[in-house]
Amino acid sequence: GGPHGPYKQSERLDTYRPYVDKLIEDGHAYYCWCSQERLAQLRADRAAAKSPQTGYDRMCLGMTKEERAKLPGFTENPVVRMRVPDDVELGFDDLIRGHVRAPRPDDQVILKADGFPTYHMAVVVDDHLMGIDTVVRGEEWISSTPKHILLYTWLGWQVPRFAHMPLLRNSDKSKISKRKNPAARLMWFREQGYLPDALRNFLQLLAYPILGKGQEVESFESFVARFDWADIATGGPVFDLKKLDWLNGQYIRNLGPEALTSRVFEYVDRM
């Protein structure tokens, strides 16, 4: 449900296509008929030559389908690429990190050969149509932000505020993933008997400074009242389950007899 449905991208293909067509008509995007084999060979040739150049070489830019079909490496099923200008602005203001400068993007694919949009196109269209004014996501998306700002600008839309959160790390500093760490799955915490408030408090501690020494247990209301984007730590916080165990114990001991009994029965029923 909800006022902005449908929410599955596969059910919104007719929503995305008009915006892709507009970008093509305005000269901000173009069809690319290069085959996967041709693109793979391009990457291999550059690697062999130790070329610093990366990204697509714009072979199809300015060509019609008929013109491109006469050249090697052609496919009947094109993708659509955004045409990134040479003078693209690479800097943007981040709510957490201040002014950030990202690498220069290449001509990103925004519509795949099967008619599905890539993340870059879909997220911009969806966020705009759903009224999102603040985008909060992981720091791995910093490099994509100039592309997204371009798409917002080309489509005549208000650019949202961006906040790029630090990624949670395992104890060995590697990125947390579902394959390596069961704790990457939200329902795992419920299955293990962690209380929601304990988990919320734990996540606060990972990226936000505590009130003071010995004041690690904090209500959500207190946290919201003192929240400031600029205070979020940018270093990759380590996911320490021992700290979560301790916090869970604090919250369990603060439960009244009836609440504790209810929680125990809920946990047993799920076993």
Question: Residue spans of the language-model regions?
Answer:
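Short beta-strand to alpha-helix junction loop
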Residues: 9-13
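Short glycine-enriched loop/turn motifs at secondary-structure junctions
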Residues: 2-3, 130, 182-183
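Active-site cores that bind ATP or allylic diphosphates and position pyrophosphate for catalysis
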Residues: 22-25, 30-176, 185
